[in-house]
Amino acid sequence: MLIESFEDVVRYLDGTYSPSAMPSIKDTRTYRLSRERELLKLLHNPEKELKCIHVAGSKGKGTTSAYLASLISGGKAKVGLYMSPHVYDYRERWMLSDPKGEDPISFFKDDDYIKAACIMQSYLDDHKKLKLKDGISPTQFELYTAYAFVLFKYAKIKVAVIETGLGGRLDATNVIQSSACVLTHIEKEHTDILGDDIKEITREKCGIIKSGVPVFALKGSDEVNSVIEKECEKMGSELFFCDHKTTDLSPLAIKGDSAYTDFHLAVTVAEHLGIKCDEKNKCRTYPLTLPARGEVTLEKDRIVILDGAHTVDSIKELCKNVTTIVQNIRPHDTINKQKDWYSSLENNAENFRTVIPLIDKYPRAVIFSCLENKDFIGMFDVLIKEFDVIALTSIDGYKKSNMKKIVTETEIVLNKAKQRRVKKIIIDDDIEECLAKIESLECPDIKDSVKVIVITGSFYLCSSFIGG
């Protein structure tokens, strides 16, 4: 196919892998590094020309990665940033932090994306090559990862921050020889793949640790810390533990305690790599925002918060920070300020200025769904204590939610709950219908109209809300 636009790039990448060859969530045998290594060999190993910082964890890895890319580019080097998933735009997966750019992170030029795809296509023009030695085509994520390395190489990027997709040990990104390994907050997740025990999960995340390479880890539970220490000792890697930074005067655009913690971790790593993190460099990074991290828009006179929180701890923090997020509404963010959808925040600013001071007095609603392999029960148990209305919906696409399971487990959690605030449960497969039902809600237990609606549980859910 002819690749002449970024849309063509996406069509090429998504048309190259075989959907039938995607790894089964239940079949960990298909998670292996051999396919990625073989694919990169066909592409002349572009990853070997990059100095990479590898980031893994359960939550905060995207924010930490973005902060780190911005701080390193403050040292005058162009930095590539590979993250997943995207929320609004595929280009969020492959970004740039340019010391000469206006924003801390931005998209590459479309010509760069197109050139990288054309180069990739020239190496892989015979699709039969993509039936690799095990007879299975590369997965979508494996192709996206390989494309990132090709893009960075031909855009003359020398340093890249690489975020894992899932786990660490068998993640497609774990083909790199990193200069530093970063471990953010670790908790139970993906138990069907990574294991049901926090120690086992931590060991999987620690799989990114390379021999003799320094490791920077956020302090966790004693069990988590112990595993990290043992894995670093085994690999002969120096370990630097970082404390949670819950109070900070840094005027970060992303609000919440974890943002300060992620920023502090990124500064620690950057300084160890020889980057001068003075106030000038930090000030350049403070305005950085990412989609669906406490992001706000308006639906009529209601404030809608989009947040991709998908673990129990991140849901707890989101609930804690709802008021703070609303009181710090920003009219623009780095990535999406060009979108007409986001301009509604400015157009309707007057509508909610009177609401903000009284925000805690109004009923709150949450539209929630999560992927099948997430801790739905743990997250839902938090939400019933914090919201008056909960709307349960579904996620479509390759990564889906199990609506039947969610509804069944909802009843179990509600029956067992000793304490709850929720007064109304709405169930609908369509997120827009959930929103409409909340807006037209008539419930004797809820006297005032809902003024704050939170959409959370998955980045994929946030994406579906705005048609990403």
Positions of PLM-derived features:
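Short functional linear segments
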Residues: 1-57, 64-75, 82, 101, ...
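Acidic, Mg2+-coordinating active-site environments of NTP-dependent enzymes
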Residues: 50, 127-133, 155-163, 178-280
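N-terminal phosphate/diphosphate-binding loop that engages ATP/GTP or pyrophosphate donors
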Residues: 66-123
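Phosphate-binding/switch loop-helix module in NTP-utilizing enzymes
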Residues: 119-166
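Short, high-confidence coil segments that cap the C-terminus of an alpha-helix
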Residues: 156-158, 361, 448-450
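Nucleotide phosphate-binding/pyrophosphate-handling subdomain across enzymes
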Residues: 159-164, 171-182, 187-190, 200, ...
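C-terminal helical cap/extension that packs against the catalytic core
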Residues: 221-240, 339, 347, 380-452
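Active-site-proximal loop/hinge segments that shape catalytic or ion-binding/gating pockets
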Residues: 458
